[in-house]
């Protein structure tokens, strides 16, 4: 059971400056030799080549490790071939592990399914053949818009088997966002569901998708999974039920060898403009990164551990540490369809106890929610199976870290606070649980083979203190480009400090021990519950409302969700500034992007701070929203707008805010 917890105990833990690895953990850890850091930094290419050969099975062994002749368009293991589906399925079955459970699936209403590696291999081969029969070929993009059900894994690996890059779309996105992602990727097929379940309610999915993709010329096939029992229309010739497609397909589909640089998937991430970024990850480098970090950071023993990453597969964390990382290592994982507070607030801990979860990976937002709900919920359950905890998605504050350590980990489990991005593909900065003395709130050190640094604005490295986080050497799992937009790729990531330095977009601090403390975004991306949302995309949604003349959004600190969205909105002349209008705008944003993007606060504004060139100064908006002096306003077109906004914000402070969305990324 969890260790007794009290405010007094928390105060005691806050005085502890570091938490060394437990002796027993260190003795059996995969990464237990401190020399691994020096070995990797002495020759990073040799290190990564060793990981690629050790962790993966290659059809054609590579002879060239890194081609860096055209930075920032790096190529890893380019003359090798392999298949991601084979590395996640076939080789484990061939090694005699076909009966090992790949996923304990737990449905929202308590349904349970165990899927073995052999089960998944059989279904993946049939779906792959079914897609080929519908005309899907190597290089064709396949959209996937599914809830957290086993078919989402089958769909991803079936695409990988035939070389069709998949583009998974988070199930919480609105149909219009789905259309945009399918359109810009020229997706040839979409795999979706009849409906989705959330907290006891069922929402139609297929019917909404139909409306969104009505005139999308490139989309030739929609495969529909019966998931929620929702009625939905089926268009003859285009639409096919999942079970019918599999039922008519041959059961043998050999995995096709893919060039290491062949795109494995696209994943659309929020940027500082309204257009989402289609991040491209390739087969050999991405698999090397996630297979290696899964093994070293989470230290799984496939024979006895049960791993649970609570992320949705629609986000990079789900790609890397629900699907590809665990499966490349032959692990047993948990997949959960529902929310952390349904049917009650102890459902996660019931699942941990039920399946004897030993490694648990979730987001600080979820931890803060559990803190708010109280220790009585985890105290109902036996959590003694846990031996390692992890966090992902945003920085975790020391208080939440220590609560996680004490209440969930029983003060015996190391915590790996992981920093990485959709763009990096795999974890970049994290403790190694058998080696690293952890500090609450710090991501600690770059992993072996990763070169991270802090720069000042002039590009000079900072040994200690605050700066801009950068990665100074290429790594295998890095994004290769933005889909059909190489110029934006260079401009976004490799223009500030040159083509050989990856600009992260996060600020950080490095302490006297060389530990990194991530301080947050320095661009216009808003991080709500670990979900990255584009300020420009939210503004575009608000302005699309017929009664809105202008909108500007910013992020403010939020105790529960890390950050929340505050929108300053100018209504068209004659529109009454009423509370009912605020709720209408929240619903409007939810309909165009998704509930996660709903502004927690909407403040009526006559104007917003802009430079003389018309650029919105969101930094000043954030200062005002958080009650700080906005400081120098000499670059503004009209500095008097600041006082007006401060007054409007102070007045709004007296009114209740909208409820935040605390969905799971995790």
Where are these regions (language model features)?
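Conserved C-terminal "lid"/linker of ANL adenylate-forming enzymes
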Residues: 221, 526, 552-559, 563-570, ...
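Conserved pre-ATP/AMP-binding loop-to-beta segment of ANL
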Residues: 99-101, 223-224, 235-268, 275, ...
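Conserved AMP-binding/adenylation subdomain of ANL enzymes
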Residues: 287-306, 316-358, 372-376
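Conserved AMP-binding/adenylate-forming core of the ANL superfamily
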Residues: 85-86, 99, 103-157, 174-179, ...
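Gly/Ser/Thr-rich phosphate-binding loop
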Residues: 243, 324, 328-331, 358-362, ...
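ANL superfamily adenylate-forming
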Residues: 109-110, 189-260, 374
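Conserved ATP-binding/catalytic segment of the ANL
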Residues: 461-463, 470-536, 543-544, 561, ...
């Amino acid at each position: 059971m969890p260790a007794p917890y009290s405010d007094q105990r928390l105060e005691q833990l806050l005085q502890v400056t570091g938490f060394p690895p437990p002796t027993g953990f260190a003795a059996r850890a995969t990464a237990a030799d401190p020399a691994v850091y020096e070995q990797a930094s002495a020759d990073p290419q040799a290190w990564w080549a060793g990981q690629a050969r050790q962790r993966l099975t290659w059809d054609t062994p590579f002879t060239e490790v890194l081609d860096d002749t055209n930075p920032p368009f790096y190529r890893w293991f380019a003359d090798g071939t392999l298949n991601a589906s084979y590395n996640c399925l076939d080789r484990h079955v061939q090694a005699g592990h076909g009966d090992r459970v790949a996923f304990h699936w737990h449905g929202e209403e308590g349904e349970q399914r165990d899927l073995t590696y052999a089960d998944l291999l059989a279904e993946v081969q049939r779906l792959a053949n079914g897609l080929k029969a519908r005309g899907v070929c190597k290089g064709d993009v396949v959209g996937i818009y599914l809830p957290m059900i086993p078919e989402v894994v089958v769909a991803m690996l079936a695409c990988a088997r035939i070389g069709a890059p998949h583009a998974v779309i988070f199930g919480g996105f609105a149909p219009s966002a789905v259309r945009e992602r399918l359109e810009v990727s020229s997706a040839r097929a979409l795999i979706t569901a009849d409906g989705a379940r959330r907290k006891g309610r069922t929402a139609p999915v297929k019917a909404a998708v139909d409306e969104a993709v009505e005139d999308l010329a490139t989309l030739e096939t929609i495969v529909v999974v019966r998931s929620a029992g929702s009625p939905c229309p089926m268009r003859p010739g285009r639409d096919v039920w999942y079970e019918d497609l599999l039922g008519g397909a041959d059961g043998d589909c050999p995995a096709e060898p893919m060039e290491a640089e062949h795109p494995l998937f696209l994943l659309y991430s929020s940027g500082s403009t309204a257009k989402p970024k289609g991040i491209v990850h390739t087969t050999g480098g991405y698999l090397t990164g996630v297979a290696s970090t899964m093994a070293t950071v989470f230290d799984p023993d496939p024979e006895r551990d049960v791993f649970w990453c609570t992320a949705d597969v629609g986000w990079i964390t789900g790609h890397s540490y629900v699907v590809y990382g665990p499966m490349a290592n032959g692990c047993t994982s948990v997949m959960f369809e529902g929310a952390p507070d349904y049917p009650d607030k102890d459902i996660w801990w019931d699942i941990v106890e039920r399946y004897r979860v030993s490694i648990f990976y979730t987001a600080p937002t979820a931890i803060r929610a559990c803190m708010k709900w109280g220790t009585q919920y985890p105290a109902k359950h036996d959590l003694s199976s846990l031996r390692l905890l992890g966090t992902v998605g945003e920085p975790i504050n020391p208080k939440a870290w220590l609560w996680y350590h004490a209440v969930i980990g029983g003060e015996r489990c190391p915590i790996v606070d992981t920093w990485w991005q959709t763009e990096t593909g795999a974890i970049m900065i994290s403790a190694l649980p058998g080696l690293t003395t952890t500090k609450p709130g710090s991501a600690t050190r770059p992993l072996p083979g990763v070169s991270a640094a802090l720069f000042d604005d002039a590009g000079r490295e900072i040994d200690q203190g605050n700066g801009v986080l950068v990665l100074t050497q290429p790594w295998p799992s890095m994004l290769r480009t933005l889909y059909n937009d190489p110029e934006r790729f260079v401009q976004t990531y490799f223009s500030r400090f040159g083509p050989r330095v990856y600009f992260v977009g996060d600020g950080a601090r490095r302490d006297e021990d060389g530990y990194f403390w991530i301080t947050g975004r320095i661009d216009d991306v808003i991080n709500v519950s670990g979900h990255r949302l584009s300020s420009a995309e939210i503004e575009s949604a608000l302005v699309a409302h017929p009664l809105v003349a202008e909108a500007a959004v910013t992020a403010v600190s939020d105790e529960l969700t890390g950050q929340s969205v505050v929108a300053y909105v100018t209504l068209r002349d004659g529109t009454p500034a009423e509370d009912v209008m605020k709720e209408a705008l929240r619903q409007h944003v939810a309909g165009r992007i998704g509930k996660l993007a709903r502004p927690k606060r909407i403040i009526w504004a006559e104007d917003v701070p802009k430079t003389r060139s018309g650029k919105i100064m969101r930094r000043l908006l954030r200062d005002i929203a958080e009650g700080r002096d906005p400081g120098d306003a000499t670059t503004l077109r009209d500095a008097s707008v600041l006082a007006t906004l401060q007054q409007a914000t102070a007045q709004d402070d007296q009114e209740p805010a909208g409820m935040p969305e605390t969905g799971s990324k995790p």
